[in-house]
Amino acid sequence: MTQSIKKELLFKTAEGNPVYKFRIPNNTGDYVDVTNCGASISGIYVHRPDMSMEDLAGANTLPILGGSLGKVLSDTVWSVMEEGENHVLFAQELNGADSPFGVSVKVGLRITWVNLNRLIVDIFATPAEAAAVNIEGNISIDSSGKAFGICTFCPSLTDSSGNETAVAESAYKGMAFAPLYCETPIFLNHSEEIKPMIELADDKSLLRLSVYSTFDSASCSKDEAASRVNIKAFSSGEEQLKKGQTLTHGIILGIDYIHTPAEDDGVEPTPLSCLF
């Protein structure tokens, strides 16, 4: 990294808690803006193929944490625990009365922005007592002027009745892109490792959004009124944790603009071409 995070104090709450905006750059001049108010992304600024800048987050600042924890913490000012070279780490603690799990829980959220325009989100939850815990991550994208199609790398999905069925027997078979309407099925891959889940594509802008996750479930919904596409990664069920045990999950959003054949004409191949 040759650039560093820029930190700006936006305001202080009535209780005196500081609300910051962090601008995290990478070496290509693309950057993300995040804030500790709700642990939210307020901007994803990337260069289009013509080198103009686009904000994929749009006008709204939306929390990353979803599910039952997100409902409780979406308006909370999180503590800033760490400011790294290309990441920030936020933390919050809920007492048993406020926790959706019935016990006190410590929650952490780390946002990292790296070269090649990869946004990495890590979510942590540690209960003070044994409890069944579930966490969820959300990333929201401005869809103005775009018509996204979606394909999945997952082997199965849940149908409208909640039954698990093979992707090979659905409209998404063969990694075919299907139009993104209101809401997709839930795509399932029960492998515990980080793996590709879904990909979104807009042919007009040549934009590709790839979602990798350690969660076993992913879905996508389209909000026409707000001109947004909401990507959700989550666990299909609760995970039973012991006292002090930490549940960790991660999401990677890859942002790419594909090149047309015309753009590739005249480009001399190099020994490294196979890597791109």
Can you name each region flagged by the protein language model?
Residues T2-F276:
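An exposed, glycine/acidic-rich loop-and-rim segment of catalytic or binding clefts
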